[in-house]
């Protein structure tokens, strides 16, 4: 069903790509290349291919502050708290102060997705004749919007006021960059003003984008500045060519002024114009959107014991279920990050860690484990929301607090499983079934860990007796017997797996996985991709030629995926030895409703409440507290807070105030979250830690993005983790120049666009860290780190297994082990 | 001496763009004496442009955060030309909108500047309003580094300025309402303030008023000094961590 859901998305996207591509190709012969309709189609195609947000989804403006990205729709609350530190992750907030002013800013954002597609490019030249009434000339005006909106309706003459400012001009001829909002609109204007060879005509390159992107402009400035510089070079190239042409034809004289307005750049330089527009559409705007709309991971402080608890449980869960006792996949991966990529990711901004998997749930769990080893971590206080405990359940809570997680009876876990299956069965929509399946998997994951650990022993009859004695209902007794049987069954299966210690047993288990993995593949794999344009074209063609057969395949897959089967498939992928609970269990659950309320699993991070959006952590609480403490607005007299120091011949008297900043305000916690994110439907070049679907398509995207990164760097690395094939590969790409480095001025201008003409060689080196269940050659330091990680995990396991350890002692020891992992260095 | 500066600027009816206060920091462990200013006659300033201290003999304010001196003065003897160039650009050369929204500009002469403009209603001013802006200046030729700092503290900086501007507006509103007896008419006047055009009509009966008088807060500039010091310290502090 996961494959169906992702395939539905892919099919829908493919259909749109095909349709819009068709529009584009049909329109091109009849109208100019840069008519708005055709360009809009291209924009949507490019953006749709790069981003995973649903296209053309209208959202009302009043929901803006609480709207979360659609990518989070399938994530349970527990997983949100693990990955993001909050259940509520809205889009990056535009500045709200405008709304506080009555009467101002009546325009509102009517559609998030539509606005973020639109942009406007304005190139304007201002002649030096101040007396001239019309001394501005529109060189280029380009808007991407099929639907009429406020961006297009603003006349260039109105925008000039904000592009150039007042007619008063400074005496210097300095190049200037500006970022500003336009009042009574939802636009942000980014402008570069420069002069050509110190003449007095100014040239402005302006980019209009929606205001919702304002918070991410500063972070994306290198990308925006690069585009502005590229466009500036292009325009200077036009002017230089024009001057040379005039000199050659003899029309040039010292008195004539070279102006852009004398050149029809659309007619004479269509190729360069297209490159400029495409660079913006395919790199700059998607980057702004990614930083604004894709939620980023929150790295908990290393002193937060609730987090450390959940993290270790996740590792134990992974090792028990995914790795097994022989394979060292996870410790090796953790060691690789601790000893190498933690430093590389911080120093080399283009390096990445990418997890390739067809299973979103598993990939997100691995992301949670790995992200805890990275920097920078949040160092502030975590707000814990107080939980209301009712009087009738306080006794149960008190009893639970005395029990350790390890001692949780299997009866409660099994009943929880049955409850989730019952809930998933009642859903008719297959998508909802998929959602519930994920919820079920996430909620069952941690409890089942305890069940599996208990699998080493025969179930304790004493616990069963205790459960029976607690309840006076006869129907509860019926629940116990099937649950005990189920527990015994899984116990026997697990023992069978562990007894057969031959490597072949795991190999035979792995042989089953390709069948399931193929089911989850979201898109057809492409053997070769030269560029993203080729990718789109090929995908569109395939979609068009085989639409009927793909529809039949989708139908057959849907029929095969019954509501009863979908939880089984998801569970089987993680717990292959667990059977599906039969229908009698479901019937029995209906007879014992009181038990369900008392057995809810208490997630340690449940009460974490962090105010944040996709990009940043809110600073409102910090500023409120600081303002009250520092400025003391309620105090009318501040005489007691300062004293007068006498002056001397150099300076007058000094009013010296107290420093009211204590440790809480001295060090501001992290605001801008690092660019790590969750499982995405497509690889995204702007994030350093992410997961995406496995397949040749994703790997091609990764390789292509590394090549694109080398346009501005000489070296880049990526760590690729393929969960399906159990690969860990360290891919390094290096650029070496060969031959003559002298370039013509033309090639210099189009430095970033004509890569093929540059004389250099790309060298790629792939190091296999872990492949086909075997560990590759490791350096001594990496091997030492692997041993350290394994020993740390074993110590933590013993820590959580020992029932006699005091809770506080266990927490402090767990924090110490976690801290040693986070601060491991090779010298140690 | 840090490259980051926070200024409070004012577009005076008579004198045009003016710096009211500038907050800078000096080297850690020093007294910051190079940033202190000597005595100057306050009569040469108009009321509107004056940094008004609660103690009349003082000309500088100073506080220490982690042994770093933060100093607020009427003008900066070190960056006088730079700040004048910045406020002329912000007030005269650009189309300034006093709506609490940020305006960012960068060039090699003036560095990176983030300007947030706001205005206060005052019937004694031309156009019935007085115009101010807070300016965060990063005196650096590296645009990328300046943008990186701005990006890392975006919510903090915008929110910090908003807090002080909201405080000034609120106490100004209280002072205005307290001064006049008819509450309904005053509220209507304040609300209509939003629709006043941008033209400043000449009227010789207008006179300058100080922010202290507009807000009826004798210690307003002390609060501004302490708040700017806190913002500066936080913004500078994190850059040193890595």
Swiss-Prot record, chain A:
List of residues that carry Phosphoserine: 401
Biased composition (Polar residues): 392-405
Keywords: Amino-acid transport, Phosphoprotein, Protein transport, Transport
Any one annotated GO CC term: FNIP-folliculin RagC/D GAP
Domain uDENN FNIP1/2-type, first and last residues per copy: 114-302
Extent of Low complexity compositional bias: 543-562
Chain segments carrying region Disordered: 1-25, 392-411, 423-444, 538-569
Alphabetical GO biological process terms: amino acid transport; cellular response to amino acid stimulus; positive regulation of TORC1 signaling; protein transport
Family listed: Belongs to the LST4 family.
Protein name: Protein LST4
Species this protein is from: Saccharomyces cerevisiae (strain ATCC 204508 / S288c) (Baker's yeast)
From Swiss-Prot, chain B:
Domain uDENN FLCN/SMCR8-type: 48-212
Miscellaneous remark of the record: Present with 656 molecules/cell in log phase SD medium.
Cysteine disulfide links: none
A single Gene Ontology CC term: cytosol
Gene Ontology biological process terms from the UniProt entry: cellular response to amino acid stimulus; positive regulation of TORC1 signaling
Record-linked Pfam families: Folliculin
Name the UniProt record assigns to this protein: Protein LST7
Disruption phenotype: Sensitive to high hydrostatic pressure (mechanical stress).
Entry function: Required for the nitrogen-regulated transport of amino acid permeases GAP1 and PUT4 from the Golgi to the cell surface.
GO MF annotation: an example: GTPase activator activity
């Amino acid at each position: 069903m996961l494959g169906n859901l992702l395939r539905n998305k892919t099919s829908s996207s493919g259909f749109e790509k095909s349709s819009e591509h068709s529009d584009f190709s049909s329109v091109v012969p009849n109208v100019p290349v840069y008519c708005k309709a055709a360009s809009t189609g291209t924009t949507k195609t490019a953006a749709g291919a790069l981003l995973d947000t649903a296209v053309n989804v209208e959202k009302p403006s009043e929901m803006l502050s609480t709207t979360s990205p659609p990518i989070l729709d399938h994530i349970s609350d527990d997983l949100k708290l693990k990955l993001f530190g909050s259940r509520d992750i809205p889009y990056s907030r535009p500045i709200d102060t405008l709304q506080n002013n009555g009467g101002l800013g009546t325009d509102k954002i009517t559609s998030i997705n539509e606005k973020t597609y639109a942009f406007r490019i304005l190139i304007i030249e201002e002649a030096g004749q101040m007396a001239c009434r019309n001394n501005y000339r529109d060189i280029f005006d380009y808007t991407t919007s099929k639907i009429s909106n406020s961006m297009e309706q603003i006349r260039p003459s109105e925008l000039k006021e904000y592009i150039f400012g007042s007619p008063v001009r400074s005496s210097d001829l300095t190049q200037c960059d500006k970022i500003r909002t336009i009042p009574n609109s939802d636009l942000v204007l980014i402008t570069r003003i420069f002069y050509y060879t110190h003449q007095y005509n100014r040239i402005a390159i302006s980019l209009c984008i929606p205001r919702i992107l304002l918070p991410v402009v500063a972070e994306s400035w290198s990308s925006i500045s690069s585009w502005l510089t590229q466009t500036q070079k292009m325009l200077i190239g036009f002017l230089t060519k024009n001057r040379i042409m005039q000199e050659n034809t003899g029309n040039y004289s010292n008195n004539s002024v070279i102006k852009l307005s004398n050149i029809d750049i659309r007619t004479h330089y269509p190729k360069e114009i297209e490159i400029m527009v495409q660079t913006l559409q395919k790199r700059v705007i998607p980057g702004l959107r990614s930083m604004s709309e894709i939620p980023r991971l929150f790295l908990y402080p290393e002193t937060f014991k609730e987090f450390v608890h959940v993290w270790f449980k996740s590792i134990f869960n992974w090792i028990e279920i995914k790795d097994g006792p022989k394979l060292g996949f996870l410790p090796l991966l953790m060691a690789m990050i601790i000893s190498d990529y933690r430093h590389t990711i911080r120093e080399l901004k283009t390096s990445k860690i990418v997890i390739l998997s067809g299973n979103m749930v598993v990939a997100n769990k691995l992301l949670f484990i790995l992200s805890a080893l990275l920097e920078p971590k949040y160092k502030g206080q975590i707000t814990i929301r107080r939980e209301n405990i009712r009087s009738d359940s306080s006794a149960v809570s008190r009893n639970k607090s005395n029990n350790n997680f390890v001692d949780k009876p299997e009866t409660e876990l099994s009943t929880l499983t049955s409850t989730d299956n019952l809930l998933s069965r009642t859903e008719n929509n297959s998508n909802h079934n998929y959602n519930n399946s994920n919820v079920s998997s996430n909620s069952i994951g941690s409890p089942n860990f305890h069940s599996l650990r208990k699998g080493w022993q025969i179930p304790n009859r004493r616990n069963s007796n205790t459960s029976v004695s607690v309840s006076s209902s006869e129907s509860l007794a019926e629940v116990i017997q099937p649950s005990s049987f189920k527990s015994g069954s899984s116990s026997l299966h697990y023992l069978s797996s562990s007894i057969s210690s031959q490597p072949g047993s795991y190999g035979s288990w792995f042989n089953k996985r390709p069948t399931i993995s193929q089911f989850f593949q979201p898109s057809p794999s492409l053997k070769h991709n030269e560029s993203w344009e080729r990718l789109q074209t090929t995908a569109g063609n395939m979609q068009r030629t085989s639409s009927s057969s793909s529809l039949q395949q989708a139908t057959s897959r849907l029929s095969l995926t019954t509501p009863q089967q979908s939880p089984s498939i998801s569970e089987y992928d993680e717990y292959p030895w667990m059977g599906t609970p039969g229908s009698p269990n479901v019937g029995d659950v209906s007879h014992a409703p009181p038990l369900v309320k008392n057995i809810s699993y208490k997630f340690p991070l449940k009460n974490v409440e962090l105010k944040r959006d996709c990009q940043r952590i809110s600073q409102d609480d910090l500023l409120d507290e600081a303002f009250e403490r520092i400025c003391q607005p309620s105090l009318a007299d501040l005489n007691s807070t300062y004293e007068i120091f006498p002056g001397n011949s150099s300076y007058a008297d000094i009013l010296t105030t107290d420093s009211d900043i204590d440790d809480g305000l001295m060090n501001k916690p992290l605001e801008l979250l690092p660019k790590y994110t969750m499982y995405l439907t497509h690889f995204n070049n702007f994030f350093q830690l992410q997961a995406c679907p496995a397949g040749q398509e994703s790997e091609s995207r990764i390789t292509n993005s590394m090549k694109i990164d080398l346009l501005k760097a000489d070296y880049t690395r990526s760590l690729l983790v393929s969960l399906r094939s159990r690969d860990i590969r360290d891919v390094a790409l290096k650029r070496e120049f060969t031959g003559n480095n002298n370039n013509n001025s033309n090639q210099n201008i189009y430095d970033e666009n004509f890569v093929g003409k540059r004389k250099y060689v790309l060298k790629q080196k792939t190091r296999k860290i872990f492949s086909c269940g075997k560990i590759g050659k490791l350096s001594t330091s990496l091997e030492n780190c692997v041993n350290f990680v394994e020993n740390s995990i074993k110590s933590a396991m013993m820590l959580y297994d020992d029932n006699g350890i005091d809770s506080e002692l266990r927490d402090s020891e767990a924090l110490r082990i976690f801290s040693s992992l986070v601060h491991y260095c090779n010298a140690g | 001496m840090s490259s980051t500066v926070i200024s409070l600027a004012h577009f005076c009816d008579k004198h045009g763009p003016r710096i009211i206060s500038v907050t800078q920091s000096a080297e850690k462990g020093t007294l910051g004496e190079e940033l202190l200013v000597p005595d100057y006659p306050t009569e040469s300033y108009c009321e509107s442009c004056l940094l008004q201290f609660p103690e009349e003999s003082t000309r500088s304010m100073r506080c220490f955060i982690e042994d770093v001196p933060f100093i607020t003065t009427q003008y900066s003897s070190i960056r006088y030309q730079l700040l004048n160039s910045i406020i002329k650009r912000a007030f005269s050369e650009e189309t300034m909108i006093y709506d609490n929204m940020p305006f960012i500009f960068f060039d090699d002469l003036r560095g990176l500047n983030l300007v947030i403009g706001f205005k206060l209603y005052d019937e004694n001013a031309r156009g019935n309003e007085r115009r101010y802006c807070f300016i965060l200046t990063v005196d650096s030729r590296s645009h990328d580094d300046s943008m990186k700092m701005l990006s890392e503290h975006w919510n903090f900086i915008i929110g910090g300025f908003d807090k002080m501007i909201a405080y000034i507006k609120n106490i100004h509103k209280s002072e205005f309402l307290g001064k006049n007896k008819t509450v309904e008419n005053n509220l209507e006047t304040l609300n209509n303030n939003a629709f006043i055009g941008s033209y400043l009509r000449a009227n010789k009966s207008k006179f300058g008023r100080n922010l202290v008088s507009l807000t009826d807060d004798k210690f307003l500039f002390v609060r501004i000094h302490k708040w700017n010091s806190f913002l500066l310290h936080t913004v500078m502090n994190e850059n040193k961590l890595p």
